[in-house]
From Swiss-Prot:
Superkingdom as given in the UniProt entry: Bacteria
GO MF terms, alphabetically ordered: NADH dehydrogenase activity; oxidoreductase activity, acting on NAD(P)H, quinone or similar compound as acceptor; quinone binding
Annotated membrane topology: Multi-pass membrane protein
A GO CC term assigned to this protein in UniProt: plasma membrane
Annotated source species: Desulfitobacterium hafniense (strain Y51)
Protein name (record): NADH-quinone oxidoreductase subunit H
Length: 351
């Protein structure tokens, strides 16, 4: 138990040691330095996670299709992603002649930068938050909304009909599913009376909110799958219909940033679900808190990959019907039931 406690305290002690290098450990420069170090670590985690998740998803796709998947490069094919990345870096970076060059070039940066910002407010473990915001839930939802604009920028600036159609699909889909996703989080906010993600995790010390908010958890998983544009909700890049959607004209490193951004958004969405519904770093003392956090995130990522390779892509009208006529009423019903439960608790037990 002492070893587990030491591992839990390790990030906090390292941060304290770095702050101790400054004359005032809590000065502006110390805060900026710690924030910069945290963001660099998040970028490293995102890149490593994406490299691992890409080959893992190909393995899961093979398992779901009763085939071995990549099995040539490295032990059982686990070096395949490295070879693909090197090949991608060697490709020519082309820009269409009639494209809006500025928007065309900054759209991939937005897609890759958004999950970096969202992960800065996620508590990965005890005292392991880059920026502990009181309005963490608001910040997350506000920043992720920008990805809709980035996809529309990519589609419109390419000056390609297929790209524009994919961008318009992205706007329709992500705005539609963002509303029930927001409402699914309101139940947890009502229970905890806070938007601070660290306080939400601490409120789950006795019982994760998945047991108190099962409807909200299911709604969040479905909407999260749609928000990160993964099957069966990947209509914006339906290759049989519109080639690759807003990514059609992108090549080389810029296309790679979109690819990395997809997996980074997946990690960020699963990290938020773990924080809000699965107790974050809370868990039995056999592992340090940050290990429990990443195990839960890994489980949700596996579920997302399993769904992608199990269910077929749905039609656009079915997509909209599910969001507006099924998930949104369920989310509103969950808010009503949560409010009723809180009232009964305060009236009977709390009073």
């Amino acid at each position: 138990m002492e070893a587990i406690r030491a591992l839990n305290e390790l990030p906090k002690n390292i941060a304290a040691a770095i702050r101790g290098l400054f004359a005032d450990p809590y000065s502006l420069w110390a805060d900026l330095t710690m924030t910069l170090i945290g963001m660099i670590l998040i970028i490293v985690v995102i890149v490593i996670s994406a490299l691992l998740l890409i080959v893992l998803e190909r393995k899961i796709a093979g398992w779901g299709s009763q085939r071995p998947g990549p099995n040539r490069l490295g032990p059982r094919g686990w070096f395949q992603t490295i070879a693909d990345a090197l090949k991608l870096l060697g490709k020519e970076d082309l820009t269409p002649a009639n494209a809006d060059r500025i928007m065309f070039k900054i759209a991939p940066m937005f897609i890759f930068g958004i999950p970096i910002l969202t992960l800065t407010i996620i508590p990965f473990g005890y005292a392991m938050t880059v920026i502990d915001l009181e309005l963490g839930v608001f910040f997350y939802l506000g920043i992720t909304s920008v990805s809709t604009l980035a996809l529309l920028m990519a589609g419109w600036s390419s000056n390609n009909k297929y790209s524009l159609l994919g961008g318009m699909r992205a706007v329709a889909q992500m705005i539609s599913y963002e509303i029930p996703l927001i409402f699914s989080l309101l139940g947890v906010v009502m229970l905890t009376q806070t938007f601070n993600l660290t306080k939400i995790v601490e409120a789950q010390a006795a019982l994760p909110f998945i047991f108190l908010q099962p409807i909200a958890f299911i709604i969040f998983l479905i909407c999260g799958q749609a928000e990160v544009n993964r099957a069966p909700f990947d209509l914006l890049e339906a290759d049989q219909e519109i080639i690759a959607g807003p990514f059609t004209e992108y090549t080389g490193l810029r296309w790679g940033l979109f690819y990395l951004g997809e997996y980074a958004n997946l990690v960020a969405m699963c990290a938020l679900a773990t924080t809000v519904f699965l107790g974050g770093w809370q868990g039995p003392g056999v592992l340090p808190g940050w290990a429990w956090f990443w195990l839960k995130v890994g489980l949700l990522i596996f579920i997302s990959m399993w769904v992608r390779w199990t269910f077929p892509r749905i039609r656009i009208d079915h997509l909209m019907h599910l969001a507006w006529k099924v998930l949104l009423p369920l989310a509103l019903l969950n808010i009503l039931l949560t409010g009723l439960g809180i009232y009964i608790y305060q009236l009977v037990i709390g009073g």
